């Protein structure tokens, strides 16, 4: 898979300084691109080659001239060495002639071993005997003292265990490599043999034909071909070839990395071009590179499986690695950047408060590694090493998504949204009010670039990005209040009343407060809490009411304490509130479960209201739909779920199912509720 990176970056000069978002043109971002190599899915989009400027061409020409000068100096030095007197005398010595031994035949089972593998394994007893012999040989006191210390060390149990581990690893490392397959079409070969044997009537030929037709042999040949096909796709790279290739990079620190990569596990690394070099830009969580811990950001790739990489375009690197699996041998120049060892990162779970599509984002480092999500999705963030681009999985996709995806970091998203809002305010004239938008008197304010460290109120009120979440399972004796939200005539009041009527022992409503006088048949504490206007206004000032209003010069309201009384009784508190009350409710300790009751299509809504004997005008229906959009846009981050009320009976059953699920399954709630 090919991914391209248009590196719109955020500069952070210090904690106290203003952070700026680079909103450069897409053409400018074409110069800074990454490509993710060997990633899952048919997502490859080729990257247009980057045109080098005249300055870059001059630098490249200078590098080529320096290389040629080094080659000429090396040849001159070699000529000087070849002309030395000592080499001339050595050249006059006749070469030694070997003797042919006709009695030696390697085909009779004797295998010549390379001196590289002829390693003698020393046992602990041999080491002890050697030290004893040395102790008797050396007579001075200092040597005797040193030998005594060594003997004590050899007799130590920990040393003996370490010695055994060393020997075991040595034996394993010097084992011969497994045999390399000669063919990958054993099945075809067996079929060809059977064709040849058809006209043959010898007993041995018939036995061989019957043997090749047995299910076990056919299964064996099939397995052989599958394994051989995988092994033969990559030519084995021997140590001699690797070390021979390193010689051309003399003077540079080079490391060799071998990674075992299965066919179904992507490599999980992005690369970029820096002049002729191919540099590892990013290591993605979940890939073979991250699991091995051997590739690092900033490493320059010189070779992969003996193929030279320096000078190649990232598209060529993508094509090269597209189908590679098995043992990958990298020759690298390690990054010069000294990074502290990565701390063990804690996974955080966040709820997204905005929609994101990486294909529409010109600043995503790796477009095809970008993770799309919708408002309300839960993301599991596993890496914040790059503060601008987090690595995350979407809830429910962990098993189907081998690599983590890239999502905008919270600070980065807040910064560019603030910049967009500033630009839009400068460009757009004040519009006339619409059905869903009341006019506001804009206060004059000093325009400053957004600073995440100083504008907490600005974040919370205007720029919604992510909210950290935790799983919460409600206790059996402390039920979460159920809040129904929706525009008028969408059925939330009918659904609430049906629940109250059908299951009176399970659901209850909070007793409201009022300043009006008690009427006959009304019971204080059951129908209303009757209080004075002065006490009511004092409670408003103290923030004790979830919502309140005035009707016929009397104040009415629902208090947090009234809801808490229902919860303490063991029942489920049912409330139907306005959206303006949600912030106060969420900031309380009540842990509400908020369900948005949305209307169906305009035609279906007209039919539902007609059943109730209502005949709304077309503009009234449009106003309900627009009000729904406004509520979702401005308050959707408060909603836990939504129900489209296209049929009241079905909506009731769905509402009951969601409420019952709170007893059996943990739910995601803001982490601040559990602290």
UniProtKB/Swiss-Prot annotation:
| GO process annotations (BP) | central nervous system neuron development; cerebral cortex development; regulation of transforming growth factor beta receptor signaling pathway
MF annotations from Gene Ontology: ATP binding
* Membrane topology designation: Peripheral membrane protein
Q: What transmembrane ranges does the database entry give?
A: none
Family annotation (InterPro entries): GK/Ca_channel_bsu, Guanylate_kin-like_dom, Guanylate_kinase_CS, L27_C, L27_dom, L27_dom_sf, L27_N, MAGUK
Residues recorded as binding ATP, renumbered to this chain, are: 486-493
Its localization reads: Golgi apparatus; Cell membrane; Endomembrane system; Cell junction, Tight junction
**Keywords linked to the UniProt accession:** ATP-binding, Cell junction, Cell membrane, Cell projection, Golgi apparatus, Membrane, Nucleotide-binding, Phosphoprotein, Repeat, SH3 domain, Tight junction
Q: Where is this region: Disordered?
A: 1-34, 51-78
Q: Where is this region: Interaction with PARD6B?
A: 21-140
Output a single Gene Ontology CC term carried by this record: bicellular tight junction
Location, primary (coarse class): Golgi
| Sequence ranges assigned to domain Guanylate kinase-like in this UniProt record | 479-660
Under CDD domains, the record lists: GMPK, PDZ_MPP5-like, SH3_MPP5
Q: PROSITE patterns, alphabetically?
A: GUANYLATE_KINASE_1, GUANYLATE_KINASE_2, L27, PDZ, SH3
Compositional bias of kind Basic and acidic residues: 10-34, 54-78
Q: Where is the PDZ domain?
A: 256-336
Q: Where does the record place the modification Phosphoserine?
A: 14, 25, 83-84
Q: Say if the entry is tagged with keyword ATP-binding.
A: yes
User: Positions of the region Required for the correct localization of PALS1 and PATJ at cell-cell contacts and the normal formation of tight junctions and adherens junctions?
Assistant: 1-345
Give the UniProt family note. Answer: Belongs to the MAGUK family.
Q: What does this protein do?
A: Plays a role in tight junction biogenesis and in the establishment of cell polarity in epithelial cells. Also involved in adherens junction biogenesis by ensuring correct localization of the exocyst complex protein EXOC4/SEC8 which allows trafficking of adherens junction structural component CDH1 to the cell surface. Plays a role through its interaction with CDH5 in vascular lumen formation and endothelial membrane polarity. Required during embryonic and postnatal retinal development.
Q: What is stated about domains?
A: The L27 domain 1 functions in targeting to the tight junctions by binding to and stabilizing PATJ. The PDZ domain binds to the C-terminus of SC6A1.
Q: What is the name of this protein?
A: Protein PALS1
User: Source species, please?
Assistant: Pongo abelii (Sumatran orangutan)
The encoding gene: PALS1
């Amino acid at each position: 898979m090919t991914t391209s990176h248009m590196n719109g970056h955020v500069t952070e000069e210090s904690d106290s300084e203003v952070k700026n978002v680079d909103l450069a043109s897409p053409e400018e971002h074409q110069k800074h691109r990454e490509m993710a190599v060997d990633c899952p899915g048919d997502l490859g989009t080729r990257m247009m080659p980057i045109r080098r400027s005249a300055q870059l061409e001059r630098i490249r020409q200078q590098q080529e001239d320096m290389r040629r000068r080094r080659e000429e100096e090396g040849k001159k030095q070699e000529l000087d060495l070849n002309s030395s007197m000592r080499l001339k005398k050595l050249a006059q010595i006749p070469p030694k002639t070997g003797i042919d031994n006709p009695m030696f035949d390697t085909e009779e089972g004797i295998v010549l071993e390379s001196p590289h593998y002829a390693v003698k394994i020393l046992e602990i007893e041999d080491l002890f005997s050697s030290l004893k012999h040395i102790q008797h040989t050396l007579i001075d006191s200092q040597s005797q003292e040193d030998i005594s210390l060594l003997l004590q060390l050899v007799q130590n149990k920990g040393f003996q265990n370490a010695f055994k581990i060393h020997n075991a690893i040595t034996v394993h490392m010097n084992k011969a490599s497994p045999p390399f397959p000669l063919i990958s079409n054993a099945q075809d070969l067996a079929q060809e043999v059977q064709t040849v044997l058809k006209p043959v009537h010898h007993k041995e030929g018939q036995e061989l034909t019957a043997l090749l037709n047995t299910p076990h042999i056919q299964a064996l040949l099939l397995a052989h071909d599958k394994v051989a096909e995988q092994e033969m796709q990559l030519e084995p790279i021997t140590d001699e070839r690797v070390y021979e290739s390193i010689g051309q990079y003399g003077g540079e620190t080079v490391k060799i990395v071998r990674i075992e990569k299965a066919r179904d596990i992507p490599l999980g690394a992005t690369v970029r071009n820096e002049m002729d070099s191919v540099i590892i830009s990013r290591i993605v969580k979940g890939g073979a590179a991250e699991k091995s811990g051997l590739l690092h950001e900033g490493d320059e790739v010189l070779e992969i499986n003996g193929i030279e990489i320096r000078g190649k375009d990232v598209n060529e690197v993508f094509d090269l690695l597209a189908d590679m699996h098995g043992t990958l041998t990298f020759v690298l120049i390690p990054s010069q950047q000294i990074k502290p060892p990565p701390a063990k990162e804690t996974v955080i779970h966040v709820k997204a408060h905005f929609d994101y599509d990486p294909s529409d984002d010109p600043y995503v480092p790796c477009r095809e590694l970008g993770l799309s999500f919708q408002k309300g999705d839960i993301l599991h963030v596993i890496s914040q090493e790059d503060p601008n681009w987090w690595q995350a999985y979407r809830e429910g996709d962990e098993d189907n998504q081998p690599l983590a995806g890239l999502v905008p970091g919270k600070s980065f998203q807040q910064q560019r949204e603030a910049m967009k809002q500033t630009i839009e305010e400068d460009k757009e004239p004040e519009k006339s009010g619409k059905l869903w938008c009341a006019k506001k008197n804009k206060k004059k304010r000093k325009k400053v670039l957004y600073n995440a460290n100083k504008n907490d109120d600005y974040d919370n009120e205007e720029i919604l990005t992510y909210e950290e979440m935790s799983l919460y399972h409600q206790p059996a004796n402390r039920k979460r209040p159920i809040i129904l939200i929706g525009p008028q005539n969408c059925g939330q009041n009918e659904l609430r009343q049906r629940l109250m009527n059908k299951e009176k022992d399970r659901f209850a409503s909070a007793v409201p407060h009022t300043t009006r006088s008690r009427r006959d048949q009304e019971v204080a504490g059951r129908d209303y809490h009757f209080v004075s206007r002065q006490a009511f206004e004092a409670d408003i000032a103290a923030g004790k009411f979830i919502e309140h209003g005035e009707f016929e010069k009397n104040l009415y309201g629902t208090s947090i304490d009234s809801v808490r009384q229902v919860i303490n009784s063991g029942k489920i508190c049912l409330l139907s509130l306005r959206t303006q009350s949600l912030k106060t409710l969420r900031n309380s300790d009540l842990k509400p479960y908020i369900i948005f009751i949305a209307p169906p299509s305009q035609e279906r809504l007209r039919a539902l209201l007609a059943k109730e004997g209502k005949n709304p005008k077309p503009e009234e229906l449009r106003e309900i739909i627009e009000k729904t959009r406004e509520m979702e846009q401005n308050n959707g981050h408060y909603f836990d779920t939504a129900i489209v009320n296209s049929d009241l009976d079905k909506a009731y059953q769905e509402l009951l199912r969601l409420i019952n699920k709170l007893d059996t399954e943990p739910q995601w709630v803001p982490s601040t509720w559990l602290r």
